């Protein structure tokens, strides 16, 4: 059964939309990411305009993240204090990001910026995460292996305004998570992602949080940051397709529950390795689409 998407102005099969939501929701619960880094490119591949895909995906991420957080809360794997600090920075950053999104859309450059952002950030983060996870797996297989810290203390840990985060067993400056949250918030607005593909590595390698707590805490802040993005996109750019978002939401809520259960079966380094491979695959696909010769060199659209 096909359904017409009013904002995207195309028709898609309901089963495909719900299936995409379920698959990405599963990955959201498994890796602690909003899933936007996969869903937004997938929507673009299926013909959804990039600007609509970005704004709509932010709405769907809220639902899948809520579902994932509830599951992690039952396991006490959420650091609410750390999540709140990240959230403050995220709301500030996402507000700036939406204004930048509107400016680029008016200039006619938003589609190119979205695709280039995916290629650059996903490629860089995916490569670094894969490299580290492979090293961690090799260390665990060596006889007499010992645990190695994923992060090292440096000048960042000497910043002022220090706070104690008991659930994460950290005593660090609040400026660090604030800055990380703001940066991820900007990306959430421009790329239509929850920012988990950057937030999760940053929480592990920069903040030094335990992997078990990172997933739930990441999803917690994603809920509110992407909700802010959805509201601002609806008001300023009118690019949120609520019909598409509702169908994606239906599949995502169910998929996130199964993903959370599956995540318990894997070790931290295995989770990071799988996430890195997913991120790299999307980056390569987006980069390939930018350089290949398009089927139609020119297109004609009616001015509205």
Feature roles, as predicted:
Residues 1-20, 74-183, 205, 235-304:
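Juxtamembrane transmembrane-helix boundary motif
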Residues 21, 25-33, 37, 64-69, ...:
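Transmembrane alpha-helical segments of multi-pass membrane transport proteins and ion-pumping complexes
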Residues 36-83:
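Juxtamembrane transmembrane-helix termini in multi-pass membrane transport proteins
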Residues 39-52, 188, 198-213, 232:
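Interfacial segments of multi-pass membrane proteins
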Residues 47-57, 81-85, 208-218, 242-246:
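The feature identifies polytopic integral membrane transport proteins across all domains of life
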Residues 54-65, 87-91, 218-223, 252-253, ...:
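Transmembrane helix-bundle signature of multi-pass membrane transporters/permeases
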Residues 190, 194, 207-210, 214, ...:
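Alpha-helix capping/termination and helix-coil
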Residues 191, 195-201, 211-217, 243, ...:
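Extended hydrophobic-aromatic, low-complexity segments
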């Amino acid at each position: 059964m096909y359904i017409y998407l009013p904002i995207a102005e195309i028709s898609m099969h309901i089963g495909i939309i719900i299936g995409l939501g379920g698959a990405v929701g599963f990955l959201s619960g498994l890796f602690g990411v909003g899933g936007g880094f996969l869903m937004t490119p997938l929507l673009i591949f299926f013909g959804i305009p990039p600007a609509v895909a970005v704004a709509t995906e932010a709405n769907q991420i809220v639902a899948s993240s809520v579902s994932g957080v509830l599951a992690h809360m039952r396991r006490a794997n959420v650091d609410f204090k750390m999540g709140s600090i990240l959230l403050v920075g995220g709301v500030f950053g996402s507000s700036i990001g939406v204004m930048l999104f509107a400016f680029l859309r008016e200039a006619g450059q938003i589609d190119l910026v979205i695709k280039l952002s995916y290629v650059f950030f996903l490629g860089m983060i995916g490569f670094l995460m894969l490299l580290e996870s492979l090293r961690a797996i090799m260390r665990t297989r060596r006889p007499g292996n010992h645990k190695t810290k994923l992060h090292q203390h440096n000048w960042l840990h000497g910043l002022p305004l220090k706070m104690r985060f008991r659930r994460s067993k950290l005593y660090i400056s609040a400026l660090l998570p604030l800055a990380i949250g703001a940066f991820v918030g900007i990306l959430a607005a421009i790329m239509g992602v929850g920012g988990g593909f950057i937030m999760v590595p940053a929480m592990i390698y920069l903040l030094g949080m335990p992997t078990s707590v990172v997933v739930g805490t990441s999803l917690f802040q994603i809920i509110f940051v992407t909700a802010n993005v959805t509201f601002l996109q609806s008001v300023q750019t009118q690019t949120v397709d609520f019909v598409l978002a509702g169908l994606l939401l239906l599949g995502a809520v169910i998929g996130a529950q199964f993903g959370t259960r599956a995540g318990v079966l894997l070790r931290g380094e295995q989770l990071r390795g799988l996430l890195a491979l997913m991120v790299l695959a999307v980056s390569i696909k987006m980069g390939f689409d930018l350089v290949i010769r398009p089927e139609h060199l020119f297109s004609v659209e009616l001015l509205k």
